[in-house]
């Protein structure tokens, strides 16, 4: 289910009030864990490799791309996860964990500071590596 359709489906009668509440609950719960995980992974990354580029953002975006590809593909035609938990993981956790807005801001600041090569590298690394890892997650899920 597409997240923006929760309320629409509730009013259309295809989603119960309990189902709607559970999806919203899991999105919030998993979202909190996603935010905390992003904070931890970014901080850990910066202590390992420094802050020459926004490596913390790159690492969470790469990991998030892989995990989203894996979870979406592994649960696409499966009942391993309830729809509510799946929504919590994909929309909540991944929404809190990945950071496209931060990537955009940090890249803009690099341009603004005159670090054009670093800004370009940040764009290429985030887009290319995240696409590759999303594909790897999907490929892994198909083999499970």
Model-derived segments and spans:
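Membrane-interface helix-loop junctions in multi-pass transporters/channels
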Residues: 3-144
């Amino acid at each position: 289910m597409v997240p923006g359709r929760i309320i629409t489906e509730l009013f259309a009668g295809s989603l119960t009030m309990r189902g709607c509440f559970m999806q919203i609950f899991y999105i919030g719960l998993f979202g909190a864990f996603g935010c905390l995980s992003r904070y931890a992974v970014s901080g850990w990354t910066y202590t390992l490799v420094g802050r020459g580029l926004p490596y913390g953002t790159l690492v969470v975006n790469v990991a998030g791309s892989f995990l989203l590809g894996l979870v979406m593909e592994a649960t696409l035609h499966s009942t391993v996860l309830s729809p509510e938990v799946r929504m919590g993981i994909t929309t909540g956790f991944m929404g809190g964990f990945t950071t496209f807005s931060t990537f955009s801001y940090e890249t803009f600041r690099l341009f603004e500071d005159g670090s054009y090569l670093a800004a370009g590298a940040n764009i290429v690394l985030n887009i290319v590596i995240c696409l590759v890892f999303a594909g790897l997650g999907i490929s892994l899920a198909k083999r499970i």
